[in-house]
């Protein structure tokens, strides 16, 4: 369902993202096929995606086994990085005293999205922060893009966002599904 449980008629994709009109995401997911949509997530290390079980609900983030904040941050970081996914690590390179490489995580990048598609998505997500459901994440003198997400009865609440230098994902909820009052 749409975030506000209302139908708004035809609209731009930017407005659909900005106002969490999830029926638009559902329709696009059906057009590109769930198999294609899920393949992008799998390329970015979403390890618990079951294409056969999560087929249609995947358009709205409804996955049988859920996703982690690390997986979500990696997905959004790929958008911030012009479509290039980089596996999260706190160590990129270690070289010993004799200049021998001990650990090298610098060449693990993989292109997931076209640069132009990533930049268009960033523009849409920028609108979410400027004047949509994510205005609380707007930072003065910084370019921030992101998306809010809320499950039915606010059992889970998400914000995933990024700037030029940082990507973050915030999840609020309980270990066992329980409504959080006063959350929007």
Label every PLM stretch briefly.
Residues 15, 66-184:
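A penicillin-recognizing enzyme superfamily signal
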